[in-house]
Amino acid sequence: MPPSLRFGVVHDFRSPPGSEIGLPEVYAQAMEQISLVDQLGLDLVWFTEHHFLDDGHLPNFVPVAGAVAARTSHVRISTDICLLPFAHPVRLAEDLAVLDNLSGGRMELGIGMGYASHEFAGFGLPRSRRVSLVEEGIQILRLAWSGERFSFKGKRWDFDDLLVTPRPVQPGGPPLWVAGMTAASAERAARFDTHLLPQGARDEVLDPWRARVAELGRNPDDYRVGIIRSCFVTDDPDRDWLPIRTAERYRASVYARFFSETPDKLSSFERGREAIPQGWIVGDVDHCVSELTSFIREYGITDVVTWGAAPGLPPSAMNASLERFAKEVVPRVRAGLSAGV
């Protein structure tokens, strides 16, 4: 049976220099919003990770996930993404196991290998090690969550006769996702039997992943495909969208800087090819329903999250839109897709 459609929010907890709101208030309002998201019956809360930025971008999702687990009862908690090369895999396995118990089995983990050179330099790691660190890390996480003693000897990590406790609530541990911008990362997600967080061009990531999953004897429709595709519901876009659009230009500029310091070609992002859409959908309920339904159907998306805050603006500024999204947009999207409309 294909996975159910899920919707939610994603947060990065940042306050750019000169913002009207400081980081303590960003965290406080985001937590209040996440409680609202849980009460509204949305399905997901995701977090991003980056390091050494003057806007305070969330560097570690673990404490925040613990706070969310303690104040919610429904939403599933995950990352888009956890930068696995910068984490000790055994410690991360322990953290996720504790979080899975704390949340009653609501944890998932989206994994990426990173690309920004300044982050690898900051952790004293050669960027050339990122593939092996991710691939060994995935193997170690799964061994650690097996509930059995394990040993591992690899290129980067070497452990002997370890038992990781507590056991996660979910058998085998929190579900894993792999993020991908290239055909190589799509192949990695298929090979390690994970869900997919695609970015970049469809024919570089999404289509090769589906083909490789099928080659391995599995059905790609049994897996989840998740993406950040934000939706701002308003009856007056000219009035309400302007401050958020201005703030979002800051986020785009930060990622452009990351790509500019990257020594290799990542994907369509820097070659000007058309990527899987991740821009905002802005408009009234009918417009948002139509655009989101078409997007989900065209790309086979199962999980959609919208930004819970624009950089430098209070998370509370998004709450009215989120309420309409949950109450007026999501039910119609679900109904339309299930009916084949």
Please place each PLM-identified region on the residue numbering.
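An alpha-helical appendage that flanks or caps ligand/catalytic pockets
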Residues: 3, 11, 39, 129-164, ...
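Conserved, mostly hydrophobic/aromatic
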Residues: 41, 49, 68, 99, ...
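Internal, glycine-rich beta/alpha segment that forms the wall or movable "lid"
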Residues: 2-5, 85-192, 202-207, 211-222
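N-terminal beta1-alpha1-beta2 module of alpha/beta enzyme domains
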Residues: 1-76, 172-174
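Glycine-enriched alpha-helix->loop->beta-strand junction motifs that scaffold or abut catalytic
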Residues: 72-74, 103, 188-197, 300
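Hydrophobic faces of well-ordered beta-strands that scaffold small-molecule active sites
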Residues: 7-11, 45-47, 77-79, 107-111, ...
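Short, acidic/polar
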Residues: 24-36, 95, 180-187, 287-294
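Active-site mouth loops of central-metabolism enzymes
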Residues: 13-27, 82-90, 171-180, 276-285
